[in-house]
Amino acid sequence: MKTRILTFATAAALLFTAHSAVALTKSTTFNVSSSVAANCTISATDLNFGAYDPLVANKTTALDVNTTVTVLCTKGSNGVTVGLDLGTHGAAANRFMSNGTDSLQYELYSNSAGGTVWSNGGAGLVTWPVFGPIGAGAGTPHTVFGRVPAGQDVSVGSYTDIITATVNF
């Protein structure tokens, strides 16, 4: 009889242990989301006309140079335009570099020197093309054509201006 009680107790203990080892599970779901807003970056390299010679080299020939403005936007950014202001010494619709006492006129163009003036509004805004690979660190460059007109009567000195390039998106 003692053996039967011990066997019964052992069986009961095993049954209880086996029952508690069976775990129940429940599941749920949750949403994952994010949003990507239109965003752009803009950079530009300096434009250096170099030496302007109003007596010989540039007496009848304009001084033409170019630089680049580069824009990188998130994929799907639409209606992106880039404008260039008149600079810190601009007046009316003209751009000028200054040496503090005298001014040297110049202009910036979007298609070629002497073509379409690149401005900050209207027809002078440049509509940016379809953008290349996103996230590759490279943007879409566009050439800025600069021209100092020939035959300007200006004083000796260093002439400078500061242009602000703005990306609208």
Report residues per predicted region:
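N-terminal small/polar-rich segments of proteins
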Residues: 22-98, 128-169
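Solvent-exposed strand-loop boundary residues in beta-sheet-rich modules
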Residues: 112-114, 169
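Predominantly extracellular/luminal cell-surface or secreted proteins
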Residues: 85-87, 107-111
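N-terminal signal peptide c-region/cleavage motif recognized by signal peptidases
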Residues: 17-20
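Polar, enzyme-active/binding microenvironments
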Residues: 12
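Glycan-recognition/cleft segments
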Residues: 95-97, 101-108
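Short beta-strand and strand-turn-strand segments in soluble, beta-rich domains
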Residues: 42-43, 117-127
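Bacterial N-terminal signal peptides that target proteins for export
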Residues: 1-9
